[in-house]
Each structure stands twice: as structure tokens, then as C-alpha cells.
């Protein structure tokens, strides 16, 4: 009898265990990992699988049938389109407002606060920027360059990253001298130790309001709804603030 009860208990726990598959914009690489760790300690029966990339790439993959349960975009547009086209079951909900910075390594000898003049420094051969066609942070960075009237002057120096995380890796590795990345990446310990940055004024680009949705695939999982709601909690909002995000409704 004891063996039967033990078997039933184990079977029940296995049924309850769920993997939440999340596609997230690359600017969330550090913040969302920390959030997921906190969540899984709180709900050990759930596991979270995180995939990071450009918002446009995640959008296209979900439309093509990728089995993601929650989609975190670096803007509202992609999340809204998924909802309108029936690929998401929840209306897009803003979770953070992103900021962009001009970042360089401490040993580069460059001062990012001397923007935009620093971009024209003869020592600067390559400037990293995310692809503005499908990466919201890349689009905001291009808008900032245009606002300062230097885009045409530096366009031949631009090195295009697939997403904002790849863009950061270009600068950190020396493949680019400096470049535009998300503040949330610049504040991560591994980048904060080796680099310095200048915060681009918000009025130089469109606001980076970021939204998330539960996908059509995710509606089958109670755990997906649980994590979705956790992201709006006070505990989660503290993590977003830690990584430099502004919070909707608190401005």
C-alpha cells in the first residue's frame, strides 16, 4: 500500500511539473534570468527555459509555429501584432521602459560622455549598433544618431549586431570601439566591471515601451499564466529597476 501511495504521489508531481518556454528580447538577458531564478525558488514545480534574441526574430518564430509560451518584446509593436493576428491570448501588457547608452571599454581611452564628438574621433573605426530593422534598441539608437545630426557622418563606421546582446559583445571583444547598447546590459556586473557609458537622453528617440504576452501555445499551461502574473509583482519590478529600466505608471 505504501508503495502504491508513493507511486501516485510521484506521478502527480511529474504531471504538475511544467516547463515554461519564454522568448525574450536580448536586453533582458540578465534581468529576466534573475527574475526566473527568483520565480523558480518560489514555485519549484515550474521550470523556465529562456531563449533570447531580437524582438523581430521572436515575433517571426512564433508566427512560424515556435512553441514559446510567453513573449517579451523590446517594444509594444511586435506584441500587439501577435495579439491582433491571433498568436497571443492576452492583450500586450507593458512591463518596462528601456534606456539606451553609448558604451565602451574602460581601456579604450574614449569618453562616451563626449557624445556626439567622440564618434568622429579618428581612433573610432567601428561603432556597434543593433539592426534597426528588427531590434527596437537598434531603431532607437539610429533615431538618436539622426537627432544629433551625425548618422550620415558615421554610417560607414557602423557594425550591425543581430540583437542588442550581440552588439554589446562586439564592443566588449574589441570588434567595435564603442556602440549603443541597453542600459540593462551596461548595468550587468560583467559589463559594469569592464566598461563605462553615457546615458542617451530620452527625448532623442522614441520611448522604448516594452510589452509581453502569453502566446496561443502558452494558454495550455497554468504555469505560463503564473509566471506572467509574477512579472507584474513588486518583487519583479524591483529587479527591473535594478537593471536600469523605468517602470510604466511610476513616472
Predicted regions and their residues:
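Sec-dependent N-terminal signal peptides
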Residues: 3-13
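Exported/periplasmic ABC-transporter solute-binding proteins
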Residues: 17-43, 47-52, 56, 60-66, ...
